[in-house]
Amino acid sequence: MPRVKRGVTARARHKKVLKLAKGYYGARSRTYRVAVQAVTKAGQYAYRDRRQKKRQFRQLWIARINAASRQNGLSYSRFINGLKKASIEIDRKILADIAVFDKVVFATLVEKAKDALAK
């Protein structure tokens, strides 16, 4: 079996990792061994945070809707329940935008939710 010299593939792998680690601080961007660890950890954080991003935005929307609906005299859960009973299907992202940028429209939505709850 012939001898395999791996200089070319090893260099290519090192270049790939160091390119991914470009911009990192200190040895993390210069030393292959440390850069591999930094790039791997960065990938783990990126994977985890792509999932957490969805949860965090939903939390933010709910907090904004809750604050705006309480200003109009209704808790978040009763507001959402009222919208469902009034068969108004607006998702939380849009509700949060309305709550922040168009308070008059949001107030009318709260009134419709209150009317649906009263029935």
UniProtKB/Swiss-Prot annotation:
Statement: the UniProt record of this protein carries the keyword Zinc: no
Disulfide bridges in this chain: none
Listed GO CC annotations: ribonucleoprotein complex; ribosome
GO molecular function: rRNA binding; structural constituent of ribosome
Coiled-coil residues: none
An annotated GO BP: translation
Signal peptide: none
Keyword tags: Ribonucleoprotein, Ribosomal protein, RNA-binding, rRNA-binding
Keyword Ribosomal protein tagged: yes
Function: Binds directly to 23S ribosomal RNA and is necessary for the in vitro assembly process of the 50S ribosomal subunit. It is not involved in the protein synthesizing functions of that subunit.
PANTHER family named among the record's database cross-references: 39S RIBOSOMAL PROTEIN L20
Family note: Belongs to the bacterial ribosomal protein bL20 family.
Protein name: Large ribosomal subunit protein bL20
Origin species: Shewanella pealeana (strain ATCC 700345 / ANG-SQ1)
